[in-house]
Amino acid sequence: MGIDIAKDTFVACFGRIEASQHLRFGKQASFTNTAAGFEELLTWTARQQAEAAPCWFVVEATGVYYEELAYFLADNAQELSVLLPNKVKHFAQSTEQKSKTDQLDARLLCRLGLERVLPAWQPPTPALRQLRALARERQSVTQQGARLKIRRHAYQHSYQPDSRTLERLSVQQQLLLTQLQAIDQDLADLLQTEPELARKLAHLTSVPGIGLTTAITVVAETTGFALVGSERQLASYVGLDVVQHQSGLSAGAPRISRRGNVRLRTALYLPAVSSLRHNPQQIAFYARLCSRHPSGKPGVIAVMRKLLLLCYSLWKQDHPYDPHYHPAHQVRKEIAPVA
């Protein structure tokens, strides 16, 4: 069952694969993106099944609009896969589909589920959901505070600023600061009640340049890297993958796609700059890049990508950062020949 989700509605497409390996697509239906629509989906799905065989739902992670349906299906013991948009896009490019509608997208997701072996979706823990909500709230409040600071500074240096306006701007700044402190306290309380989460976050903060706020943002925005299966997929999800456009004699310079999670790219920039002052490995890596590319900006972006993939590795392997580790220096275990 492929499901294309929008803000208010979603379209479902039923399909099956026959013994001859031919794909057969059945009916499509549209439902409201509400609890009532979810119940109607299960009833409609049961009518489409010719036999009592399990149905696998394939959903694209479209913003936050898919979450209610995904949790509903999981709570009702339904098997489903939640796919990152870039994975669905790459599959669509491999097909001959040129048009794009909700119905065609639902059919495409159905076809993807029939042709590929997809990982089952595991709902994020309540702690990770709360961590993501608090991390996003903190980033939003921080950005509001930065804009308000610039606005107050500009108004203060204008001709004859109104003292009452300056006072109101100061009150707004203090309010945002109070909210930021409350969010930080909520984060501290959460980590105190979730020692396992706090322990794994400590692995990330052991990297020079990665602070607790950055570590929280990375883990929260990837929901503990649950939807990521490889370093390449992670870089693409964040928009730090390298793309190049070349045709004939026209060849553009390689650049990052920037078609990913902007929150993560924003969160990784300052840590990358900081690591170029305190992390010897990143300093050496940056120097090698600058020897080939004099412009410093691509080097900083490469350090951002390296820090992101390092966080992924430390989280998955569940161990802290080792500045002396290098894969080339590891002793290979040889298998003794059988006598």
Please state what every model-predicted region is:
Residues 1-339:
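A detector of single, family-specific signature residues
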